[in-house]
């Protein structure tokens, strides 16, 4: 997916949230804390990487996020952040 650095998608959480809607509820749930708490604070390169990540197949994302399958190297830090943010959400919101 070709993404321009000046693409307005990077500045709109609503557009990203819409793009992040997946066909699997589990993915929606794990991506939401990252989107709500981290995305807008990321630099442009990381925002661009997340938008690229969203073009992945749901089955691949599920494997990387839930089954521990090794993702492409460029996504490893992002996936670690997504999982960390979900754990933080669980600790604070699900008590």
Swiss-Prot record:
InterPro entries (UniProt xref): SDH, SDH_sf, SdhE_FAD_assembly_factor
GO annotations of cellular component type: cytoplasm
Superkingdom per UniProt: Bacteria
Name assigned to this protein: FAD assembly factor SdhE
Principal location class: cytoplasm
Protein role: An FAD assembly protein, which accelerates covalent attachment of the cofactor into other proteins. Plays an essential role in the assembly of succinate dehydrogenase (SDH, respiratory complex II), an enzyme complex that is a component of both the tricarboxylic acid cycle and the electron transport chain, and which couples the oxidation of succinate to fumarate with the reduction of ubiquinone (coenzyme Q) to ubiquinol. Required for flavinylation (covalent attachment of FAD) of the flavoprotein subunit SdhA of SDH and other flavinylated proteins as well.
Family: Belongs to the SdhE FAD assembly factor family.
UniProtKB keywords: Chaperone, Cytoplasm
Subcellular location: Cytoplasm
Lineage: Bacteria, Pseudomonadati, Pseudomonadota, Gammaproteobacteria, Thiotrichales
């Amino acid at each position: 997916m070709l993404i321009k650095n000046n693409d307005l998608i990077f500045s709109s959480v609503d557009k990203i949230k819409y793009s992040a809607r997946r066909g699997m509820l589990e993915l929606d749930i794990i991506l939401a804390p990252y989107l709500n708490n981290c995305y807008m604070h990321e630099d442009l390169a990381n925002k661009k990487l997340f938008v690229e990540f969203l073009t992945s197949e749901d089955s691949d994302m599920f494997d990387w996020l839930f089954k521990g399958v090794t993702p492409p190297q460029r996504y490893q830090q992002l996936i670690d952040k997504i999982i960390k943010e979900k754990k933080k959400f669980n600790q604070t919101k699900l008590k």
